[in-house]
Amino acid sequence: MVAADSAREAAAQLRRALRETPTVELRLDWLKSDSERRRFLVFLQRNRPRRALLIATCRRRKGGGLLAGSVQDELRWLAQAAAAGCLWCDLEVESLRKLPRGSIRKYSLPRRILLSVHDFGRMPRLDAAVGARWRGQVDAIKIAGAARTIADSVRLLRFAAKSRNCVAVPMGEVGLPARLLALREGSALAYAPVSAATAPGQVSLREMKYLYRAHALNGQTQVFGVIGDPIAHSLSPLLHNTAFIARRINAVYLPFLVKNLRDFLKAAPDFGLRGFSVTLPHKQSILRHLQDCDALSAEIGAVNTVVVRRDGSLYGCNTDYVGVLHALGKKLRLAESRVLVLGAGGSARAAAFALTRAGAAVGISARRSAAARELARSAGAEVVPHGALQTESFDAIVNATPVGMYPDTAISPLEPGELHCRVVMDLIYRPERTQLLKLAAQKRIATVSGVEMFLAQGIAQWELWMKRRAPQKSMRRAVLAALRAEERDRSSP
């Protein structure tokens, strides 16, 4: 999808898009003025790309677009797009309703018409959207509805699978997994912006093609994912999809924004999930939905990895445990060390159990005092009141809270005066250098980034699902490159 405010940028986006796909939507309404629209269409007419399928769209504001004009203005621009070489146009249903029935073919529009039904507040009534009224007037229908629940996404994918010439676009972050699977499920097209995503639930064209490989997914593709809330910050899709690509495995790993576990688990079979990672805030609550889990997960009381067995039953494991030991063990002899764990959630539980089993004396400090006491009792640790941190000393401090996580990167769970230790480890990996780690470094305290734990637990997950060795170097390289690029973007003026 080409969406730019100037003819120059639209032309540049079109060139980039055509290097990746022959089918491109041109959002003429995004161009900031009529003169920019004219300039771009002149460019298009003079530089008609060969073997390209161009779809012209000039959506009015009333239909969710940017064109400040009437239906006749919209049709005029679409007719000019046809003259410039566009074979298809996207026409909003509200515009078609304003025209006399059967009159649309009288206009000099592109040869093929894609009728768009948009609802930015909810999923529209699907059967009503594709009614008999439009038959013979249009060539295909696009349904773009806000997916408020995962069940909404499933409903739209099922509809696309049984309908001819239908384009399914589940909108919003909840709809992203279904959007990535749309082509596999029968949608005629899948949409992605040429540049970075412009709204929740979008991924860029390069991500869709090279990370998720949406065009190559088929009925044999194994589907995995990560569930959490929030989930947009997660680099797990990059980590796992990089491994699938490196090992040439027909599998994909998708991000699921999950607010209600029960709703997700009810819809999960429709995605054909073979396994999924579990992150905040579901690591503990997922336990009651599992049919079985390993002894370690039951003892910890938290799960970060689920295997979906052939009979559909769910089996839980915890690889956070491995990640903590792997990462902190590089800096510190854990046996007989005194380690403070901040937090009492799922990640904190894994850290506390891992460290006590490794022979460390563990202290728990958490905002929720009852949860801190329960974790200390079950893990064989002690409770350390927050007020004691000004005077208490430790060999290591481990932050297992989300404080400092992207996008709230300027805050730290501890003040400099509370850092009395030799090593500080932060389980947050995005950003790589959290505010807590920066404060520790200023005091010449050794630091351990959450990236090390993230990689270790993710590699263990991948090997658990795939039953083969993971391409660790490729996975590490991809994650570090993404984090360093992010850091450069943040520091550039």
Predicted segments, located by residue:
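Phosphate/diphosphate ligand-binding glycine-rich loop within oxidoreductases
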Residues: T221-L332, P431, K443
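Active-site mouth loops of central-metabolism enzymes
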Residues: M1-A10, R60-Q72, S116-P124
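Catalytic beta/alpha-barrel core
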Residues: A3, T23-L31, T57, L78, ...
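Adenosine-phosphate binding glycine-rich loop
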Residues: L427-P493
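Active-site-adjacent beta->alpha loops and helix N-cap segments on the catalytic face
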Residues: L31-R46, V93-Y107, P124-L126, R148-A160
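Glycine-rich adenosine-cofactor-binding loop
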Residues: P170, V223-I231, N318, L328, ...
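NAD(P)-binding Rossmann-fold cofactor-contacting core
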Residues: A358-A379
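Rossmann-like adenosine-cofactor binding region
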Residues: R377-V448
